[in-house]
Amino acid sequence: MGLEKSFILFSLLVLVLGWVQPSLGRKPSVQDFKRQHMDPGSPPNSRPTICNQMMKRRGITKDSCKPVNTFLHESGQRVQAICSQRQMTCKTSSRKNCHKSSSTLHITDCNLKGSSKYPNCDYTTTNRQKHIIIACEGNPLVPVHYDASV
């Protein structure tokens, strides 16, 4: 009987690890970057609820309230071109694969309000024109992580 229980527990463990493992070591991808940050062709919207709508529509608040997110209102080509700028150390980590835009871009910063609790994620919306810093990987280099605005 003990051996049977051990086998069942082992089988469940293998099944759970099969579900969890792919996301553990998963590297950021250009698809994730696009889903979380790109909003080309859309001018910055001054509606105070636009962040709430975009975060939900893009599935960014599917499992929890993300504290901060930034949407880029520029063409994919313009953002991709940032990867050809001089390489630098990222602002939010010690990674050295970041690049800073040479000009300002239209962005929308979404910041979680302090009183907000999942699943009712509530964000403040701030439209800006700032330089951005992104991490790029691959050959050719493509954006995979939004690092900061400066």
Swiss-Prot record:
Enzyme class, broadest EC rank: lyase
Catalytically driven reaction(s): an [RNA] containing cytidine + H2O = an [RNA]-3'-cytidine-3'-phosphate + a 5'-hydroxy-ribonucleotide-3'-[RNA]; an [RNA] containing uridine + H2O = an [RNA]-3'-uridine-3'-phosphate + a 5'-hydroxy-ribonucleotide-3'-[RNA]
Cellular localization per UniProt: Secreted
Binding residue positions for substrate: R35, K66, P67, V68, N69, T70, K91
GO molecular function: lyase activity; nucleic acid binding; ribonuclease A activity
TM region positions: none
Gene3D superfamilies noted in UniProt: Ribonuclease A-like domain (3.10.130.10)
Covalent S-S links between cysteines: C51-C110, C65-C121, C83-C136, C90-C98
EC number: 4.6.1.18
Record's keyword terms, sorted: Disulfide bond, Endonuclease, Hydrolase, Lyase, Nuclease, Secreted, Signal
GO cellular component: extracellular region
Signal peptide: 1-25
Gene Ontology BP, a term: defense response to Gram-positive bacterium
CDD domains: RNase_A_canonical
Pfam entry (one): RnaseA
Active-site residues, record numbering mapped to chain: H37 (proton acceptor), H145 (proton donor)
Function noted in UniProt: Endonuclease that catalyzes the cleavage of RNA on the 3' side of pyrimidine nucleotides. Acts on single-stranded and double-stranded RNA.
Family of the protein in this entry: Belongs to the pancreatic ribonuclease family.
Assembly and oligomerization: Monomer.
Name of this chain's protein: Ribonuclease pancreatic delta-type
